[in-house]
UniProtKB/Swiss-Prot annotation:
Residues where Mg(2+) binds: D46, E147
Entry keywords, A to Z: ATP-binding, Ligase, Magnesium, Metal-binding, NAD, Nucleotide-binding
GO molecular function: ATP binding; glutaminase activity; metal ion binding; NAD+ synthase (glutamine-hydrolyzing) activity; NAD+ synthase activity
Encoding gene (name): nadE
Naturally occurring in which organism (per UniProt): Sulfurisphaera tokodaii (strain DSM 16993 / JCM 10545 / NBRC 100140 / 7)
Enzyme nomenclature, EC number: 6.3.1.5
Any one Pfam family match given in the protein's UniProt record, by short name: NAD_synthase
UniProt: ATP binding residues: G40, L41, S42, G43, G44, I45, D46, S47, T142, K171, S193
Cellular component terms per the entry's GO annotation: cytoplasm
Top-level EC class: ligase
Protein name, as recorded: NH(3)-dependent NAD(+) synthetase
Disulfide bridge positions per record: none
Length: 279
């Protein structure tokens, strides 16, 4: 459960949040000397919210729908609703990636659903960057703070993007923002799922609902509370609190660039402190 104390802390002025993110997307595209942004739309809350924000930031946006046989038909229908909301009927491509996945899996003789699921995410990343390079667009990521902290994304898959506009909003906050933006209720309330295999749900894999997950993340990593206190506040077992904390710790490598072994006086990762937009 989410304590009322945490809910109040996470409830923001979503009008201001919208204005800020839209402005930053627009600025970042300009600073990057790109002409627009491209996004992968799944029909889930994160990609729906980010697509709407992108469409408000620039008229130069493009959307890719990249389903597989494990993609629920409802997700495709929901994605089309968002495309209609952003007037993107002439700004999207529908690419079924089953043939690519099957060929890849056959070549390397893979049947493990998790490995194949990660291949799906990386194929989508490759397609997004192919279109982005062709159009001189940025790849707009859709990950939220909860997923990023938990490491609940594929390294160099859905984590392979140029910018993460909602990356500092917990899943609970993204749902609130979705309500503010007019995202259809069935999308806001839909159980989050990467849909990398049939029946997959994020909350089912993790073993907790996102309101509880977000409460644990907030209380531990923003208020630095002890696990015992967090368990009491969230009415959650101590073991589950520790599980969430450990997910953050063990996924740290996903949030960092590759390690560089220092051999000189100035190693790039540890000593390279130039601005992101340089020159």
């Amino acid at each position: 459960m989410m304590p009322e104390y945490v809910r109040k802390k996470l409830t923001l002025d979503f009008g201001q949040v919208t204005d800020y993110i839209v402005r930053r997307i627009r600025e970042y595209i300009e600073e990057s000397k790109k002409e627009g942004g491209i996004i992968g739309l799944s029909g889930g809350i994160d990609s729906s919210v980010t697509t709407i924000l992108l469409s408000r930031a620039t008229n130069n946006f493009y959307i890719l729908l990249m389903p597989t046989s494990s993609t629920p038909q409802k997700d495709i229908e929901d994605a089309m609703k968002i495309i209609k909301i952003v007037n993107g009927e002439n700004k999207y491509s529908y690419i079924n990636i089953d043939e690519i996945i099957n060929e890849f899996s056959s070549i390397v003789n893979i049947s493990d659903k998790i490995v194949i699921g990660n291949i799906k995410a990386r194929v989508r990343m490759t397609l997004l960057y192919a279109f982005a390079q062709k159009m001189n667009y940025l790849v707009i990521g859709t990950g939220d703070k909860s997923e990023i902290m938990l490491g609940y994304f594929t390294k160099y898959g859905d984590g392979g993007v140029d910018v993460l506009p909602i990356g500092d909003l917990y899943k609970t906050q993204v749902r609130m923002l979705g309500n503010y933006l007019g995202v259809p209720e069935e999308i806001v309330k839909k159980p989050p799922s990467p849909a990398l295999w049939e029946g997959q749900t994020a909350e089912g894999e993790i073993g907790l609902d996102y309101e509880t997950i977000d409460s644990i993340l907030y209380l531990k990593f923003e208020e630095m509370r002890e696990p015992e206190e967090i368990a009491e506040m969230t009415k959650t077992s101590y073991d589950k609190v520790i599980k969430i904390i450990n997910m953050v710790k063990t996924s740290q490598h996903k949030r960092l660039p590759p390690e560089i072994f220092r051999l000189s006086g100035r190693a790039i990762n540890s000593d390279w402190r130039y601005p992101r937009q340089w020159g």
